[in-house]
């Protein structure tokens, strides 16, 4: 039976930071679950060629909101770990990097505690999540013609907004991956990373102009996410709005688990797309590299 604690729409204080808040109990009851929709990862002929996927995680937990509160966030564990599970099973191992080299911050309140696939891949990569590489330190290798990476993966969670969209290192990496025909995989708020190539550039030179993507809808961040107490205040800026200003075309209106591929860019709309995006990414990379 629900109690007052489960139905409160008031964000929960995070006492590790001044005026910081986790999502409300009610919002977590609506947005999280003990298991995902994972339904298997069958890749009978996994890749054995040695190319890896570079996962860029967020190293910042707190987002300063417009009302002065801090949203205690990070990367969403399902959005990170389910795509990783599929790609790992398909034969593509991961390197993990953050902008600073500090640990990846996860929204542990969204971890599906009864999902064995998610738990197993989390355990496998936990050492790398706790001690990632600094992106700048591996950038030269990552953008080289003989790069060890088949793709870059930027998972979602509101924590992505903290630094990744403004990073010159991310800008250089994404531009190089576009130029060298490598894959970019991202979902939910992760497509905020696609703003990095616009840093210090003219809008008309934006490389993702006219690309079609799936991304978490701004309408939920300005509506339901505030109404149910998922966030303690309005975001400082909106992902979709800023991408659309640069000419990106957003396909989804809501969150249904929709995924999309446009050229070498693979995107998903929300945590609900995690399993679908993992399947799409694994299939795509196997077709491209398992030859």
Swiss-Prot record:
GO cellular component, as recorded: cytoplasm
EC id: 3.1.2.-, 3.5.1.-, 3.5.1.124
Region named Disordered: 1-20
Reaction equations catalysed: N(omega)-(1-hydroxy-2-oxopropyl)-L-arginyl-[protein] + H2O = lactate + L-arginyl-[protein] + H(+); N(6)-(1-hydroxy-2-oxopropyl)-L-lysyl-[protein] + H2O = lactate + L-lysyl-[protein] + H(+); S-(1-hydroxy-2-oxopropyl)-L-cysteinyl-[protein] + H2O = lactate + L-cysteinyl-[protein] + H(+); N(omega)-(1-hydroxy-2-oxoethyl)-L-arginyl-[protein] + H2O = L-arginyl-[protein] + glycolate + H(+)
Biased composition annotated in UniProt, kind: Basic and acidic residues: 1-18
Keyword annotations from UniProtKB, A to Z: Cytoplasm, DNA damage, DNA repair, Hydrolase, Stress response
Active site annotation, chain numbering: 188 (nucleophile)
Subcellular location per the Swiss-Prot or TrEMBL entry: Cytoplasm
Principal subcellular localization: cytoplasm
Gene Ontology molecular function terms on file: glyoxalase III activity; protein deglycase activity; thiolester hydrolase activity
Domain of life: Bacteria
NCBIfam families attached to this UniProt entry: PRK04155.1
Protein name as catalogued: Protein/nucleic acid deglycase HchA
Organism: Pseudomonas aeruginosa (strain LESB58)
